[in-house]
Amino acid sequence: MSPYVFLIISISLFLGTSLTLFSNHWLMAWMGLEINTLAIIPMMTYPNHPRSTEAAIKYFLTQATASMLVMFAIIHNAWMTNQWTLFQMANSAASVLMTLALAMKLGLAPFHFWVPEVTQGIPLSSGMILLTWQKIAPTALLYQISPTLNMKVLITLAFLSTMLGGWGGLNQTHLRKILAYSSIAHMGWMTIVMMINPSLALLNLLIYIIATLTLFLMLNFASVTKIKSLTNLWNKSAPMTTAILLTLLSLGGLPPLTGFMPKWLILQELVSNNNIIMATLMALSALLNLFFYMRIIYASTLTMFPTTNNSKIQWPYPQTKTINIIPTLTIISSLLLPLTPLLTTLMY
């Protein structure tokens, strides 16, 4: 891809998200979502391949449907309340419709059908943007209308997402599909606490983005897309194998890693709001995710599939600018649990 084209696409992605984040008018927020959608499609179709083209078309059709529902909810709300202000979603029908539309954009179950297929069909770099940056704008809209959301709808979406995100990833062998189902499950954790404590939902999103970004950068650097390919990664870069292990355990929510923090705080919020049954179900659903993370860890660190090069250590990867930020991101995604009191103080 031409550097100029890549620059234009990157600026468009940034502007689209910024427009949604900083607007207080529904029409401008909707325009930001559309700019985001249209900007990433050329990136998804490069390099040109039938699978990436198919994935881009699936993504476009799904996002266009979600955008249509968003616009319908905006118009219905404006018709009933005479308000175009972003914080005014007083009409309950418009609020439910907006929640479902944003759930489709985020890939929450039962609207998750597009996430694994699209992620599997595009390159790792595009998948990284799709599962991290593209979550920011819809989440910001959910955050801003959080006081008017329907709790029953949120709980249903969140529970389905965590369960289906866990079940869907169990028998997968492709890392991109596993990360797609991981994204669905993490969006479920974020959604269930959105109405109770929106700041905690944003913290969960931030930690998820950092950990997923770290993992995608390492997989892209090693050019690995299948679990089987990870078994020889120790030959090329032993430190990267350790970094992948830590990041996956953090995504799984094991203490004392960073990923344990949002799950711990979310379960604490649910229990304090007398949602004990829901907290129990969410904690059990996290075990499904942990299982397929452990499958990846087992394949990458504890096993060695038959290969022509088992004994020789390969020449290490050349030092690049990309690998320089990986240690920093690994530390952030693994070792921030001691900062929990500080972060909770800032949130409350």
From Swiss-Prot:
Q: What is its EC number?
A: 7.1.1.2
Has the keyword tRNA processing been applied to this entry? no
The reaction(s) annotated as catalysed by this protein in its Swiss-Prot or TrEMBL entry are: a ubiquinone + NADH + 5 H(+)(in) = a ubiquinol + NAD(+) + 4 H(+)(out)
Please state where this protein is localized.
Mitochondrion inner membrane
Q: Does the keyword Translocase apply?
A: yes
For membrane topology, the record states: Multi-pass membrane protein
Using the UniProt record, name the top-level EC class of this enzyme in a single word: translocase
Q: Which family does it belong to?
A: Belongs to the complex I subunit 2 family.
**Assembly and binders:** Core subunit of respiratory chain NADH dehydrogenase (Complex I) which is composed of 45 different subunits. Interacts with TMEM242.
Q: Which protein is depicted?
A: NADH-ubiquinone oxidoreductase chain 2
- Which organism encodes this protein? Osphranter robustus
Q: Which taxonomic lineage is given here?
A: Eukaryota, Metazoa, Chordata, Craniata, Vertebrata
